[in-house]
């Protein structure tokens, strides 16, 4: 046993001293000193046990060994709290040393248990708890009399106070041990997660409490670059828990996330202290479904997910994605629908979007060219004189945004009519998509790009028709009331509203080829995820910032819309685990 104790003590000191290697900052120093102090206490307790051979010394030694791995991991966390990038080699060494500490602790506590005293410490006899006074076999009146008599005895009072204090300390000890046990479980085995949003409806509803299994995913040693080996290969359709890549990965953020996960699990997912700078709960971690695998390119068009592998010649639909993707929450059974808080797109709105998708798919670009040329010729006749200037710059980039453009349709129409260069601008705007799509060199264009070129042409045709109708009304000296109530104009504006509605939600139904490079594919050990509730899921398709984006990237004067599409894959090390069980509410309890 002496040699065994020396190995434990030496390991503890080595671990504590290594905390400051290549890591000289204040918290690392504090963690190292704390580890050395605890290691010294461990050595002192062992020496006292060997010298006194008393049961009290054994209990103290056993309790210190009980806390040994927990104190060491706390010292490690303290030493890494402000480290931007800790050296992998040192992190790996310390992690392996800690696992050694945990194993040695288990063996040591086993040796120090009461049932093993006779074998390892024959000179030490366990102290049995004595009853302060006995009431066994006494009648109620006699019991009361004995209690009252004993309470007048100062020695008895002291024994009672002593016993109460011991019991309190044991409760505190049990509470701390439970906290540390939960910490280890949360780091290496399970994580409790309470669903905060409806991105995975109908699989998960707001308030569902699920358990994620972390061990197969190779959990990371806290606040370090070291991970246990991953032996889980994710499949399409797996539901995973992952760190949100949209949040900055800073030492402060990592520490806050770590502490919040501990509090979250201790409070059974009732308290979340992981908030952003505005005090709002972070959407972190996320629960999403794996939809893209290593070696794949992805594309989402009209709500259909397509995949292409390196040896494929074309994109093919992912049939199984339709089993998970939900576009029409209103069609769910009433038992599920009543649990949903927000249904952004109902069945009728979905039909409108699908009608736009069918309309743009059916548009022949050659026919669109002819229609566009007809509109330009019609405007030339209406204006009645040829421009003598180049195309006037009527619009700034922001004014090409769909809603802004159509809101200003009457103003733009009047400027086209009255400005020298107005006709030239109209011709330039309406035909700017011609060069690329008439070049014959469009084979490299993706299905997404073709569909959005068709949508861009549809919107421009609609805008051109509105401009023509406005100028016709101007020429006819229509009154304001006639202008506002004109049926042809209002029908075109209604069509424009349909396109605007589609563009407002197109970020959820469409995504261009990802990864974008011709020879780029999702790399090894990386995955792509989306939520099942595609209209209400901010996932790996999206970023947090909306940017003004061209509907047709090959059109210099394209219609613009606000897009937050910026797809990203997630390295396997960012995946925390897979969901295995829904535990609450009990009405939805079940394996996943």
Language model feature labels by segment:
Residues 1-168, 203-592:
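Soluble "head" domains of membrane/secretory-pathway proteins
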Residues 152-191:
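Internal/C-terminal transmembrane anchor helices
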Residues 184-201, 250:
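Hydrophobic alpha-helical transmembrane segments in integral membrane proteins
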């Amino acid at each position: 046993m002496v040699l065994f104790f020396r190995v434990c003590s030496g390991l503890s000191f080595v671990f504590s001293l290594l905390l400051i290697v290549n890591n000289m900052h204040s918290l690392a120093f504090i963690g190292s000193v704390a580890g050395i102090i605890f290691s010294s206490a461990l050595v002192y307790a062992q020496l006292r046990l060997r010298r006194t051979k008393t049961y009290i010394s054994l209990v103290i030694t056993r309790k210190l060994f009980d806390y040994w791995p927990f104190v060491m991991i706390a010292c490690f966390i303290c030493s890494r709290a402000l480290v931007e990038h800790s050296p992998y080699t040192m992190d790996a060494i310390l992690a392996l040393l800690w696992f050694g500490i945990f194993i040695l602790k288990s063996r040591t506590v086993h040796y120090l248990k009461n049932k093993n005293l006779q074998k390892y410490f024959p000179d030490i006899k366990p102290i049995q708890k004595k009853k302060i006074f006995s009431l066994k076999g006494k009648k109620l009146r006699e019991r009361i009399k004995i209690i009252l008599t004993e309470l007048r005895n100062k020695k008895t009072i002291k024994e009672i106070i002593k016993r109460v204090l011991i019991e309190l300390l044991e409760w505190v000890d049990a509470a701390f041990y439970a906290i540390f046990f939960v910490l280890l479980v949360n780091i290496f085995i399970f994580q409790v997660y309470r669903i905060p949003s409806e991105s995975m409806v109908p699989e998960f509803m707001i308030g569902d409490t699920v358990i994620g299994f972390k061990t197969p995913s190779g959990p990371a040693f806290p606040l370090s670059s070291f991970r246990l080996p991953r032996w889980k290969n994710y499949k399409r359709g797996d539901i995973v828990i992952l760190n949100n890549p949209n949040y900055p990965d800073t030492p402060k953020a990592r520490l806050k996330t770590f502490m919040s996960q501990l509090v979250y699990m201790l409070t059974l997912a009732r308290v979340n202290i992981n908030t952003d700078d505005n005090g709002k709960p972070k959407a972190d971690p996320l629960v999403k479904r794996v939809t893209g695998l290593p070696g794949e390119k992805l594309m989402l068009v009209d709500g259909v997910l397509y995949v292409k592998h390196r040896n494929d010649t074309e994109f093919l639909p992912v049939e199984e994605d339709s089993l998970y993707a939900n576009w029409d929450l209103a069609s769910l059974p009433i038992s599920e629908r009543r649990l949903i808080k927000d249904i952004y797109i109902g069945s009728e709105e979905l039909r409108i979007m699908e009608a736009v998708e069918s309309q743009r798919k059916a548009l022949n670009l050659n026919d669109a060219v002819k229609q566009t040329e007809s509109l330009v010729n019609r405007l030339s006749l209406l204006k009645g004189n040829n421009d003598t200037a180049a195309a006037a710059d009527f619009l700034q980039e922001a004014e090409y945004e769909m809603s802004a453009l159509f809101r200003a349709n009457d103003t733009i129409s009047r400027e086209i009519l009255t400005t020298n260069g107005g006709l030239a601008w109209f011709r330039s705007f309406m035909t700017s998509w011609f060069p690329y799509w008439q070049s014959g060199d469009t084979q490299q264009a993706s299905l997404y790009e073709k569909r959005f070129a068709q949508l861009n042409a549809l919107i421009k045709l609609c805008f051109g028709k509105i401009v023509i109708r406005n100028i016709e009304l101007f020429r006819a000296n229509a009154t304001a009331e006639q202008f506002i109530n004109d049926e042809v104009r209002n029908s075109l504006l209604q069509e424009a509203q349909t396109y605007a509605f589609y563009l407002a939600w197109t970020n959820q139904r469409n995504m261009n080829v990802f990864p974008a490079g011709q020879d780029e594919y999702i790399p090894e050990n990386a995955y792509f995820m989306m939520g099942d509730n595609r209209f209400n899921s901010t996932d790996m398709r999206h970023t947090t910032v909306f940017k003004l984006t061209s509907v047709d990237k090959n059109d210099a004067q394209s219609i613009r819309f606000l897009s937050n599409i910026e797809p990203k894959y997630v390295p396997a090390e960012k995946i925390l685990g897979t969901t295995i069980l829904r535990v609450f509410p009990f009405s939805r309890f079940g394996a996943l």
